[in-house]
Every structure is written in structure tokens, then in C-alpha cells.
Amino acid sequence: MRFFIDTANIEEIKEANDLGVICGVTTNPSLIAKEGRDFIEVVKEISEIVDGPISAEVISLEHKGMIEEAEKLSKIHKNIVIKIPMTAEGLKAVKVLSSKGIKTNVTLIFSAGQALLAARAGATYVSPFVGRLDDISQNGLDLIEEIVDIFSVNSIEAQIIVASVRNPIHVLQAARMGADIATVPLKVINQMIKHPLTDKGIDSFMKDWEGASLKL
């Protein structure tokens, strides 16, 4: 499993990139709006930090508008991936963009059927949302397992990005199932780094070292 960071905050992206664990970034209109900055400027700055796929989402809900926006965004940097909502209009846009060699990430997927259609339309990535399904008392990880199985059996090349990740369990279970990528907030990355026994071990080592009056 590979890791993307799910944010439009430049400082968070820099921090995660410095850890050496991420190889891409996903954004959405809500994350961009939260930063209160120009959309294009933010995407350009991200592309200067992370050398990997950067998902930037279209705003139009009509396929012709999606295609126009996608062509504009794709010119920002070679790593730009166009994020398209899972709708009939979105699928039309994905088909056209795929034929032009523009990579797409179909987002807001909540069923295996949606993932399969997106892949067949030509999506480079599909993004099923785990946490939001959990929020309505469904098991989001069940969806990941189902999509992984379907894609494997049918030799589908579209990559699965596990999205709406709320905790390390989402990441680890999805990794065990064989999902390609998890896009996670910095908070979850930090939760995965920490373990109380690691902290305890470091404290013990330092006390022993200082007690022996040793120098490196």
C-alpha cells in the first residue's frame, strides 16, 4: 500500500513529505476553501513539494464543463490527476479525458457498482469513502474488500484509493485487503507513528545512557 495525504494545507503537506512516507496528495473543493487561497495557486505550490499524483477536483456538474476545467487543471503540472464526482455526467467526462491521456480519480464512491463503472469508463483511480459509510452504520471496509475482489477477478487496472480515512485501523485493514493506496489526513499518519511502548522504550534507553555517563 502507498500513502497519499488528504489535505490542501501546505504546511501539513511539507511535514508529511519530510517523513518520507507519502507519494501523492488528494484535495477537494472543501479542503481548498478551508485554506482561503486561490485554487490554482494552491495546486501549483503542492506540485512543487510532492513529486507524485496530485488530485484536483472539478467544480462543474455537467460533463462539458468538467472536461474544460480538467484540461485547464492538467496544464498546471504533469502530475495533476483530475478528480471527478461519481455521476452519469462524471462518467461521460472520464471517458473523454481518458481518451486524451488525462488521468482521473473518480470520487464519492459508496458502492462496488459505482467503482466498477468508473473503472470501465477509464478512471485511473477510484476513491471509495470508508468513514462516511461508517457514519451511517455501514461497514466501509466491507466495501473496500468487495472492490478489491472484483478488480482482481476481472483484471481491472484502475487503482483503489481508500478515502475518508478516520483512523489507523481503516488503513491497516485496507492494506491487508490489498487496496493500492490510502489517502489520509496528517492526524492519522501521526497516530500510526506513535505507540506508548515506543515512547517508554526511548525513555528507558535515555535514562540508562545518562546514568552510565556515556558519550557518543
Curated annotation (Swiss-Prot):
The active site is at 83 (schiff-base intermediate with substrate). Its EC number is 2.2.1.2. CDD domains: Transaldolase_FSA. Keywords: Cytoplasm, Pentose shunt, Schiff base, Transferase. Coiled coil: none annotated. Signal peptide: none annotated. Its main location: cytoplasm. It holds the Pfam family TAL_FSA. One of its GO terms (cellular component) is cytoplasm. InterPro entries: Aldolase_TIM, TAL/FSA, Transaldolase_3B, Transaldolase_3B/F6P_aldolase, Transaldolase_AS, TSA/FSA_arc/bac. It catalyses: D-sedoheptulose 7-phosphate + D-glyceraldehyde 3-phosphate = D-erythrose 4-phosphate + beta-D-fructose 6-phosphate. Pathway: Carbohydrate degradation; pentose phosphate pathway; D-glyceraldehyde 3-phosphate and beta-D-fructose 6-phosphate from D-ribose 5-phosphate and D-xylulose 5-phosphate (non-oxidative stage): step 2/3. GO terms for biological process: carbohydrate metabolic process; pentose-phosphate shunt. HAMAP family: Transaldolase_3b. Belongs to the transaldolase family. Type 3B subfamily. Transaldolase is important for the balance of metabolites in the pentose-phosphate pathway. This is Probable transaldolase. It comes from Clostridioides difficile (strain 630) (Peptoclostridium difficile). The lineage of its organism: Bacteria, Bacillati, Bacillota, Clostridia, Peptostreptococcales.
